[in-house]
Amino acid sequence: MRLDRYLGSRAQLSRQDVRRLVSDGRARVNGEVTRTLDREVRIFDCVELDGQVLQPGKVARYLMLHKPPGCVSATRDAAHRTVIDLIDEPDKDDLHIAGRLDFNTTGLMLLTNDGQWSRRLTQPTSLQGKVYLVETEDEIDPGCVEAFARGLYFRFEDLTTLPAELVLLGPRRARLTLHEGRYHQV
């Protein structure tokens, strides 16, 4: 929300009063005087007017968790243990997951209460690479490198994935970098 709108609604001031107070340097965001009416105010920002705290600013939390197999990448699930169940943190119900891993997949999970950050990280338009260390039972065919580079066609979804980078690390190990999250793409 813009600072002028926030102050108008929170302090019940007219637009004219808000403009005057802000231009006089009487508003602070995160301890710094701001004279910018259209400055974005987030739930994590501390907002003051004339030295009075209107919003203390919530602490943004970013957690890394190693997801074990047999655990669901979800905040709630009636049938299975979730990654949130693994955390012993206050206010863990405020957290959500940035990304997902399949039920029996292990790896790094990122959790946060900062929705804007997690959207930037996980939206397909960001093309943020997700790196997987893959171990297989059978040897990996070297032709898979080119197949991932072209993109894989999934008949059940009738789509071709974005190109991905597969680097062979051994006969049964590879590093795979994906730029989208398709079900069972790994």
Give the residues covered by each predicted segment.
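Basic, flexible Lys/Arg- and Gly-enriched helix-loop patches that mediate nucleic-acid binding at interfaces
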Residues: 1-185
